[in-house]
Amino acid sequence: MGGDHGPSVIIPAVARAVKRLDGRDVRYLLHGDEAAIRECLASVGDVASLCEVRHSDRVIAMDEKPAVALRRGKGTSLWNAIEAVKTGQANGAVSAGNTGALMAVSKLLLRMQSPGLERPAIVASWPTLKGITAVLDVGANVTSDAEQLVEFAIMGEAFHQAVHGSTKPTIGLLNVGSEDVKGHEEVREAQRLIREGGLDRKSVV
């Protein structure tokens, strides 16, 4: 298992998830070095009965470039975890590994599921005085053009509806100012496209 600390962090996190989701029918597929995983499982209490360990002796290094991960990643713990989602063996995948590789492998194996969406995004949710705010993209892409910013708005709306249960989320475009002349050309163009597409329910933040 990749990540900065491997199973020594992941397995205690699984144990906490088991406790928090007590009573729910949730099982865990753990991909990585079987011996290391089982050693960690033995130290965190009785959670092994809810876990299935799938051995993989290869990992994607934290400093490995996404393009290299795509060429050499098959058979790694990260690849196998995403492939389990693709084949319906898992409903979702959680990784503390190489973010760029996670995005690249996920896009390759899972594809973008809606027409017109080209890039995945990383979303973060946090509480505010008015409820939960979801922000994306927070790290999957270094640069984004106007069309991709609109895609993030579409994905953010769908995420908020599906995960947080809102019926009509407020959508805002983060910029250096609320005036139409402020910000990079890509941001100004994205704001225009969002308005024309009927997604504008907040304007610029």
Give the label of every model feature segment.
Residues L30-G32, E52-R54, S95-G97, V123-W126, ...:
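Short beta-strand segments
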